[in-house]
Amino acid sequence: MPLIAVAVVVFLAERVQVKAAFHESPLLLAAFIMGMLALVPAHEFVHALAYLKSPFSRRLIVGAWPRHGMCYLLYDGPLPRWRVLLMVAAPFLVLSVAPMLALWSGVLAPRPAVRAMLLFAVLNHTALCMGDYCIVLWRILRNVPRGALIHNAGWTTYWGAKRL
């Protein structure tokens, strides 16, 4: 929640420029809304690519749990611990860290209003990644030994030693 609060503060700090930009270009408002809505599918797609398997594999399962307000993607098969850790971290690295570095470095230097919108989107995405970090990443780092295989079976995750 603190990141979402920071995002709102950043957005409100630039509200005059943002409002003017939306007024000047109504398509910018539509693009901003579509971009925010596209964050969840993009996040799950980056997870899919990070499994380093075909995104069209029958073992790749995409779903939603509306009651809990979450979407998920999992690979129904054993994977090495390092690959699961990569899969968990990938959306944060691609959709939060990379754009933030581009904003800070000046590589991505749009108008202040667009910059505020991008920062708002990045901070919101970072907040949305907390489920990945708090639930999955932390539990794997704490409980699964290096070199182990991890297998999701339904809502249960198992791990075991690699077979030689």
Kindly give the residue locations of the regions a language model identified:
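Metalloprotease/metallohydrolase-associated module, dominated by Zn2+-dependent proteases
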Residues: 1-14, 67-164
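Active-site scaffold of zinc-dependent metalloenzymes
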Residues: 1-35, 52, 63-65, 99
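Membrane-embedded alpha-helical segments that form the functional core of polytopic membrane enzymes
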Residues: 24-41, 117-123
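Generic serine detector
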Residues: 25, 54-57, 96, 105
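Active-site recognition of the HExxH zinc-binding catalytic motif
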Residues: 39-55, 91
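Hydrophobic, membrane-facing alpha-helical anchors
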Residues: 40-45, 66-72
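Membrane-water interface of transmembrane alpha-helices
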Residues: 49-63, 137-140
